[in-house]
């Protein structure tokens, strides 16, 4: 599974500005989803890879980013 890293309180994606390989996204994805995951910056949001099937990613139901 893959998807955008999301803040569970706000419903917002984690923003990033250095597209492609991005240490911030890699670190945040690993912290949120575990060591096996990876991440990079895609369309100014952290995109996480190698997630477990039940991982919660953006968009969250009934939560809009404010």
UniProtKB/Swiss-Prot annotation:
It is found in: Secreted. Disulfide bonds join 12-65, 16-41, 25-46, 29-48. The modification Asparagine amide is found at residue 66. Its main location: secreted. Residues 1-66 form the LCN-type CS-alpha/beta domain. One of its GO terms (cellular component) is extracellular region. Expressed by the venom gland. GO terms for molecular function: sodium channel inhibitor activity; toxin activity. Keywords: Amidation, Disulfide bond, Neurotoxin, Secreted, Toxin. InterPro entries: LCN-type_CS_alpha_beta_dom, Scorpion_toxin-like, Scorpion_toxin-like_sf, Scorpion_toxinL, Scorpion_toxinL/defensin. GO terms for biological process: defense response. Beta toxins bind voltage-independently at site-4 of sodium channels (Nav) and shift the voltage of activation toward more negative potentials thereby affecting sodium channel activation and promoting spontaneous and repetitive firing. This toxin compete with high affinity with 125I-Css4 bound on rat brain synaptosome and may bind with high affinity to Nav1.1/SCN1A, Nav1.2/SCN2A and Nav1.6/SCN8A. Belongs to the long (4 C-C) scorpion toxin superfamily. Sodium channel inhibitor family. Beta subfamily. Has the structural arrangement of an alpha-helix connected to antiparallel beta-sheets by disulfide bonds (CS-alpha/beta). This is Toxin Css8.
């Amino acid at each position: 599974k893959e998807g955008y890293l999301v803040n569970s309180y706000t419903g917002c994606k984690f923003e990033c500005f250095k597209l492609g390989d991005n240490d911030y996204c890699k670190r945040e994805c690993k912290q949120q989803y575990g060591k096996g995951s990876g991440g990079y910056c895609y369309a100014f949001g952290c995109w996480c890879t190698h997630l477990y099937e039940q991982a919660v990613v953006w968009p969250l139901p009934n939560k809009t980013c404010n």
